[in-house]
Amino acid sequence: MAALKKAFGASKGARIVGDKIYVSDGTQGNYNAAKSACTNAGGQMASPQNNDENQAVLVIRNQYGVAAWLGMNDIVTEGSFRYPNGNPIIYLNWSPGEPNNLGDEDCVEMYDNGKWNDKSCGDNRLVICEF
């Protein structure tokens, strides 16, 4: 793990928080493409569970200057957002008025202020993976 932290820590699109490493190479895709990319790399989509993790993802998001996908969604049960492992979200950072499910929005994007918005899963957003 120490070698991974050293390698990723030197990368532009990488941040380390505790035992987690967040990484992006600037690739964008829809939610399913992002999920597949992160899973195929041995990780999962970035899914902040506290403010420090959210800030790490925000730094990467802002380096690329585009909205980023987060791993949480309410695809299974509308209005019940969950982490990729199926557990309920324990940390919330919704933008005011969100989630609002405007237009069948089941996925979550991060704005440039670190706040979250529910978003249509078919839109393209920055892919950030968590290891």
Task: Label the model's feature ranges.
Residues M1-G43, D112:
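Extracellular disulfide-stabilized recognition modules
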Residues G9, G13-I16, A37-T39, R61-Y64, ...:
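Intrinsically disordered, low-complexity regulatory regions enriched in Ser/Pro/Gly/Thr
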Residues R15-V17, N32-N87, V127:
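Conserved helix-loop-beta core of C-type lectin(-like) domains
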Residues D25, L92-N93, S120:
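Short linear motifs in exposed loops
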Residues D25-Q28, P48-N51, L102, D123:
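Intrinsic disorder
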Residues A56-V57, G114-W116:
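Eukaryotic intrinsically disordered and solvent-exposed regulatory patches
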Residues V66-E105, Y111-K115:
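Surface-exposed ligand-recognition segments of extracellular binding domains, strongest
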Residues C121-F131:
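Short, structured beta-strand segments at or near domain termini in extracellular proteins/domains
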